Swiss-Prot record:
Name this protein carries in UniProt: Peroxidase 72
CDD domains reported for this sequence: secretory_peroxidase
Compartments where found: Secreted
List of residues binding substrate: P170
Organism for this UniProt entry: Arabidopsis thaliana
Enzymatic reactions: 2 a phenolic donor + H2O2 = 2 a phenolic radical donor + 2 H2O
Disulfide bridge partners, by residue number: C42-C122, C75-C80, C128-C329, C207-C239
Glycosylation sites: N173, N216
Length: 336
């Protein structure tokens, strides 16, 4: 743990020189977020998050990808407001029950562990939404990716949207245009789409998310012709026509636990796992050029990924007197 924590702290110490963000206007909101939000009210907040994320990574190498995914799935539904963390209650239908999250979203217990530690340090101060944003950044750094200053000051939602989670989060079998449209609805563009998809350099996906590529991509009983035949043969060994739905596969088979640009190199070799990955290289000229750039130039990918993460983290946050600071992330304050 000590080694991982030292790497994380060393990388984060460089953000004082980062050009990515000093103060960010939140998309869809009248409020501002800024990295120094907790400097006076909870000065150890970021240190606490970093430490717990580092400890979790030592015990579970999959956790960083899970935390990145939580932040993404949170921001794409009603904005970055920690609505994804809420359990179902009398008035709330949890987003955890949606198709994109059911049986796949994870890391909730770790977020609660971080929240508990922060409540001990500075009660009712640091929002669950900000914890998600910080944990996503720290997860990127600890696996070898870029760092950035995280704008802070989000507050937590008092409700959730199951329909929003089902409809607004891009799906593995969506067309390129559908995915781009979902990004544009959030104030993001094609560059953000390609760079943020690069988070698939770590993490896993289930057989059920890409099976159609192996056996019946276009409804004609034939596999996806943009998938390497050799790679498809390997995948079929563990992802049959039926059964094994929950079997996990690396999104980046080359360096599955390292945040790097091998994801884009895989796409050029037609070895993207998901259809939503490979179409970045096969369905749009501009996105193909970006894939080629990032495959060749990891620094360019890292720089844009950091910028796009800040941009995504600014989607419609609750600020000022809106929302609340939950004491427990899985339920609203009036529930106990």
């Amino acid at each position: 743990m000590a080694k991982s924590l030292n790497i994380l702290i060393a990388a984060l110490s460089l953000i004082a020189f980062s050009p990515f963000c000093l103060c960010s206007k939140a998309y869809g909101s009248g409020g501002y977020l800024f990295p120094q939000f907790y400097d006076q009210s909870c000065p150890k907040a970021q240190e606490i998050v970093q430490s717990i994320v580092a400890k979790a990574f030592e015990h579970d190498p999959r956790m960083p990808a899970s935390l990145l995914r939580l932040h993404f799935h949170d921001c794409f539904v009603k904005g970055c407001d920690a609505s994804i963390l809420l359990d179902s209650s009398g008035t709330i239908i949890s987003e955890k029950r949606s198709n994109p999250n059911r049986n796949s979203a994870r890391g909730f217990e770790l977020i609660e562990e971080i929240k508990h530690a922060l409540e001990q340090e500075c009660p009712e101060t640091v929002s669950c939404a900000d914890i998600l944003a910080l944990a996503a950044r720290d997860s990127t750094v600890i696996t070898g990716g870029p760092s950035w200053e995280v704008p802070l000051g989000r507050r937590d939602a008092r409700g959730a949207s199951l329909s929003g989670s089902n409809n607004d989060i891009p799906a593995p079998n969506n067309t390129f245009q559908t995915i781009l449209t979902k990004f544009k609805r959030q104030g993001l563009d094609l560059v953000d789409l390609v760079s943020l998809s690069g988070s698939h350099t770590i993490g896993n996906s289930r057989c059920t998310s890409f099976r159609q590529r192996l056996y019946n991509q276009s409804g004609n009983g034939k596999p996806d012709m943009t998938l390497s035949q050799y790679y498809a043969t390997l995948l079929r060994q563990r992802c049959p026509r039926s059964g094994g739905d929950q079997t996990l596969f690396f999104l980046d088979f080359a360096t599955p636990f390292k945040f790097d640009n091998h994801y884009f190199k895989n796409l050029i070799m037609y070895k993207g796992l998901l259809s939503s990955d490979e179409i970045l290289f096969t369905k749009n000229k501009q996105s193909k050029e970006l894939v080629e750039l990032y495959a060749e130039n990891q620094e360019a990918f890292f720089e844009q990924f950091a910028k796009s993460m800040v941009k995504m983290g600014n989607i419609s946050p609750l600020t000022g007197a809106k929302g609340e600071i939950r004491r427990i992330c899985r339920r609203v304050n009036h529930a106990y």
